[in-house]
Amino acid sequence: MAKVTNRCFEATGHTAFICDFSPPRAGDPESFPQPNLDTDFISVAYNPGKAVRVNSAMLAAAIRGKTGKDVLFTLATRDMNKLALESLLLGGQMFGLDNVVVVQGDPFTERDLTRVKDVSDFTPTQMITAIADMNLGTDYRESQLRTPTGYCIGATLDLGRGIEAEATLAHRKAQAGAQFFISQPIFDVTEASRFHEAFAAASGQELALPVFFGLQVLEQDGIIFSTVPGTVKMELEDGRPGVEIALELYQDFQEAGLHNVYLVPPIRRGGARGYAATREVLAGVKRL
């Protein structure tokens, strides 16, 4: 199985795509979701919408086993203690998984907390450190593992929370052991250059790790979690196809030298995803 750092633009000289993929809300093997997405990697999300869904690592292993696609799985620190998280990572190792993305997980509301507990035994940065330690053969108790793990560790960025603050946090994550970054969708490519400048200012050196900047495929009636410019919203409302908007933004990415792309399919009410539109975008990219 390929590691993200071996398939990114910096390693190959070719644009690399990671595509987000939501686990189903059923474990019936007969309803196994077929991604059918021509991307370098399928990234299995962690319980989108804070809903009960198939475990991200298990689904990633199933996708890899049934389709041969290279995969990532997302792991949230919110829901498990150190023992559970590190045990899950050993299970992923057993199934040949090599790429993991560490997130905190969306915070629970007060209503949520009447039914479920926030564990947060690790912060995301601490979890990154712990995985890096497991790669060296040591668990959270400082006991030796029989076999070190070999995870390629991903961390996340949300430039909408403030570029300078996010750059400082990214520096800490890189120091902890992150090997690549995935960002929430951006619509202004200058945010990428400003992030790199802020990272250099915070760390004293340029960021040498690959960053997969988010490119969201929009639909008129879809749910939008990222900050979308008013002009783009107006274009959608006026009937411009989201696929067309995404392809135009992809060209902006290319002109700005952003050759690692995190593709986010449309999100529909109820949690369904618009993978058909995503396939149109990928087909359009090949024609450019």
Predicted regions and their residues:
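Conserved N-terminal beta1-alpha1 strand-loop-helix module at the mouth
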Residues: 1-44, 53
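A structural motif corresponding to the C-terminal end of an alpha-helix
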Residues: 130-142, 146, 151, 176, ...
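Short, acidic/polar
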Residues: 24-36, 56, 82-89, 162-173, ...
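Acidic (Asp/Glu)-rich catalytic clusters
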Residues: 8-12, 32-38, 57-68, 89-97, ...
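Active-site mouth loops of central-metabolism enzymes
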Residues: 13-29, 71-83, 151-165, 230-245
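Hydrophobic faces of well-ordered beta-strands that scaffold small-molecule active sites
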Residues: 15-21, 40-44, 71-75, 100-102, ...
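Catalytic-face loop-and-helix region of soluble metabolic enzyme cores
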Residues: 206-259
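Active-site-adjacent beta->alpha loops and helix N-cap segments on the catalytic face
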Residues: 2-7, 26-28, 50-63, 81-87, ...
